[in-house]
Amino acid sequence: MNIKKCKQLLMSLVVLTLAVTCLAPMSKAKAASDPIDINASAAIMIEASSGKILYSKNADKRLPIASMTKMMTEYLLLEAIDQGKVKWDQTYTPDDYVYEISQDNSLSNVPLRKDGKYTVKELYQATAIYSANAAAIAIAEIVAGSETKFVEKMNAKAKELGLTDYKFVNATGLENKDLHGHQPEGTSVNEESEVSAKDMAVLADHLITDYPEILETSSIAKTKFREGTDDEMDMPNWNFMLKGLVSEYKKATVDGLKTGSTDSAGSCFTGTAERNGMRVITVVLNAKGNLHTGRFDETKKMFDYAFDNFSMKEIYAEGDQVKGHKTISVDKGKEKEVGIVTNKAFSLPVKNGEEKNYKAKVTLNKDNLTAPVKKGTKVGKLTAEYTGDEKDYGFLNSDLAGVDLVTKENVEKANWFVLTMRSIGGFFAGIWGSIVDTVTGWF
């Protein structure tokens, strides 16, 4: 072999080595950043109790949400019930608008009689289970007097709950052009409700946390409207992942939450499932694939990823102290410091085999307190920082993530004599320190 060929061979080996070295980390990075591939315009998955995001794709992009809008309608009704402003057994008689929409067979509806009387409970179940549009408008009128005023409440509540990118234009999620010319004042005929996937997760989390009874209704696979009357009608749930339905999910208990579909929104679904104390909330916007099951196929991918790879782990128990942050200084107190502890247990969804990759992160409101100090005074926040190689999506709301650090006991203010003696001691300690520094400087 001549020298020229040797050089060419050596150069080829160098190039090959560099290529393998460079490409290997890139492959690893890609795998880390894309643990699953969700075929939808946007998606997100969170663990409910901690707000930890387990997966996210275009989650901050505002998109049409179709009938998932009814989750806000349900929230406002349940709030009104809780506040005593509306009762389950109070009755409602449809006005011309609600009657007209209820007779539109091209929309999801239970037909309502113009002179009929319907309880709030009946209208709520028709909305939550069968996504009945006229029933949702009726709820809006019951709660706010008109759908226009209800839409104002929807947007105000969205802001209050911490949503950041949203636009609610009606109580149903229908495109306004399908409201037979009755779109709420201040909205145009071409509008429909739009919310980001992340904000839908925020809404779902609040709905389940604030009014967990929603799951008692959203988990009903099928029932009847006005059973035993001339108006009896089957009401199957559009959430096919419920037990006994065509896309039933068997690894965990699916008990909600809301589907949605319009021409512009495509196929959407906010789902929730629980297993072994871990509740997962998912959102899929404009899912691709099969028209009827695509949103459930994509949700299944997220559920599988969560329940196959994560479990809830208690990072700190209630009353635990964090190494390096066991106390905080107290000015003018009988004691010069006080212990600080967690105010409740801190648990997170931890990926299998990665427990060691979670490190405590403490943020104190200030470096010291001033006596008197009451037991249970909040002094800071404890969260966990992921230090592993996998993709970390953070929390749904970083301000609310983690648990509070609070004082372990009371600290009374020291009396004037003790404070005076401390001041004198500090004064002489300062003088002595100056003398020592001066003498030390001579040698």
UniProtKB/Swiss-Prot annotation:
Substrate binds at K258. The keyword Protease applies. One of its GO terms (biological process) is peptidoglycan biosynthetic process. Its main location: secreted. The active site is at S67, K70, S131. The keyword Protease applies. It comes from the Bacteria. Removes C-terminal D-alanyl residues from sugar-peptide cell wall precursors. This is D-alanyl-D-alanine carboxypeptidase DacA. It comes from Bacillus subtilis (strain 168). The lineage of its organism: Bacteria, Bacillati, Bacillota, Bacilli, Bacillales. The gene is dacA.
